[in-house]
């Protein structure tokens, strides 16, 4: 079937979105490379935000001065930036693969607006725009770190986390209910069936980034709050654990209540949350200023509670996943054939209909003989 006018318009719009996506990825990559050289317009390197040697857990914030708070150190920030670039690269490659398979195929399909359906399921123009926003906000986040502006660092970390969250939700749900998403999957072009597995990998990879960004946004919010209000540094360190726990629990519950219906294999956020916990441990273990004071007990208990929450939700996800795989074949077998009661009811209805037709034929014969 020839592509319709709607297919042509949507394909062109989607293609333009992918072109802008590639340009944005190149822009962010160049920015990250150049930001390692302070003399090229950046006041400082982005990965050196806090001097942990000057951190004092018992001190209060001094207005108009930079107060060191709990944040990622230089090695962690470089690894974080490199990993985020790899995630952006993987998502960009995914969109390019989908574009090639949808735009360059010779068999356009037998359904009306087939390309529009395929684009809508694999990642439409709005989802591509959300991904562009995620890359742009990440670029602005690293830019604010190079200027060492606590308030802007906290703001851009929250905006980037929000954009990445919306992009992940759109990739998982396609803005539809589960039944409608299943209907669109059944109408997908046969040549895109294998790409769905690639899409599942991308969803989990984005969720890994989202899980680690939970730690980053918790640190950034408390870092900005601690540099703008008269609070003690030790209290802000403990507040990082509270913010992290609240955000991670909300996401764990959303995965178990809603998102698991759309994508069965969802362990990306759990893996990213684990890496985030390790990211919290590293600066605290590395620098003695965190543990050589009265906050040692509170920090230890906070770590224990966070790991317990993570282990509980990860175990729940694993149990539900493997239990769903074990019962999947029974569900499909039940849908394959009709039940015995339905077959018996249909047979009884057919026999009654046949008897009624025979009686009418006999009556007609009798009337004809009388005539």
From Swiss-Prot:
A Pfam family matched in the record: Herpes_glycop
Q: Which residues lie on this side of the membrane: Virion surface?
A: 35-79, 148-151, 222-239, 286-298
Cell compartments where the protein resides: Virion membrane; Host Golgi apparatus, Host trans-Golgi network; Host endosome membrane; Host nucleus inner membrane
Topology with respect to the bilayer: Multi-pass membrane protein
- Biased composition (Basic and acidic residues) is annotated at 347-359
Listed GO CC annotations: host cell endosome membrane; host cell Golgi apparatus; host cell nuclear inner membrane; plasma membrane; viral envelope; virion membrane
Name the predominant localization: virion
Q: Which residues cross the membrane?
A: 14-34, 80-100, 127-147, 152-172, 201-221, 240-260, 265-285, 299-319
Residues on the membrane's Intravirion side span 1-13, 101-126, 173-200, 261-264, 320-371
Question: For bias kind Acidic residues, which ranges apply?
Answer: 360-371
Q: What does this protein do?
A: Envelope glycoprotein important for virion assembly and egress. Plays a role in the correct incorporation of gH-gL into virion membrane. Directs the glycoprotein N (gN) to the host trans-Golgi network.
Family to which this protein belongs: Belongs to the herpesviridae glycoprotein M family.
Subunit relationships: Interacts (via N-terminus) with gN (via N-terminus). The gM-gN heterodimer forms the gCII complex.
**HAMAP family linked to this entry:** HSV_GM
Q: What is this protein called?
A: Envelope glycoprotein M
């Amino acid at each position: 079937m020839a592509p319709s006018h709607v297919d042509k318009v949507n394909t062109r719009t989607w293609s333009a979105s992918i072109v802008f996506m590639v340009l944005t990825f190149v822009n962010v990559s160049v920015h990250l490379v150049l930001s390692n050289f302070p003399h090229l317009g950046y006041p400082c390197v982005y990965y050196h935000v806090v001097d942990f040697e000057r951190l004092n857990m018992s001190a209060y914030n001094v207005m108009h001065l930079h107060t060191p708070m709990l944040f990622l150190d230089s090695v962690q920030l470089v690894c974080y930036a490199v990993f985020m670039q790899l995630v952006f690269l993987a998502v960009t490659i995914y969109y390019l693969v989908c574009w090639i398979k949808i735009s360059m195929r010779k068999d356009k399909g037998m359904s009306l607006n087939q390309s529009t359906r395929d684009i809508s399921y694999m990642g439409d123009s709005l989802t591509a725009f959300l991904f562009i926003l995620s890359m742009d906000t990440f670029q602005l986040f690293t830019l604010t770190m190079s200027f060492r502006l606590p308030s802007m660092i906290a703001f851009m970390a929250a905006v980037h986390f929000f954009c990445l969250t919306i992009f992940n939700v759109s990739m998982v749900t396609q803005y539809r209910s589960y039944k409608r998403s299943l209907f669109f999957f059944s109408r997908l072009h046969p040549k895109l069936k294998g790409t769905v597995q690639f899409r599942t990998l991308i969803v989990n990879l984005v969720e890994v980034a989202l899980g680690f960004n939970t730690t980053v946004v918790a640190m950034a919010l408390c870092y900005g709050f601690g540099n703008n209000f008269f609070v003690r540094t030790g209290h802000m360190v403990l507040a990082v654990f509270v913010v992290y726990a609240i955000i991670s629990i909300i996401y764990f519950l959303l995965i178990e209540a809603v998102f698991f219906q759309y994508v069965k294999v969802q362990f990306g956020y759990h893996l990213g949350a684990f890496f985030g916990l390790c990211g919290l441990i590293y600066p605290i273990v590395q620098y003695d200023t965190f543990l050589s004071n009265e906050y040692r007990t509170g920090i230890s208990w906070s770590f224990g509670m966070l790991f317990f929450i993570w282990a509980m939700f990860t175990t729940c996800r694993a149990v539900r996943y493997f239990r769903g795989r074990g019962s999947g074949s029974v569900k499909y077998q039940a849908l394959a054939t009709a039940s015995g009661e339905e077959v018996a009811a249909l047979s009884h209805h057919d026999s009654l209909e046949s008897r009624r037709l025979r009686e009418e034929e006999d009556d007609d014969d009798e009337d004809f003989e009388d005539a």
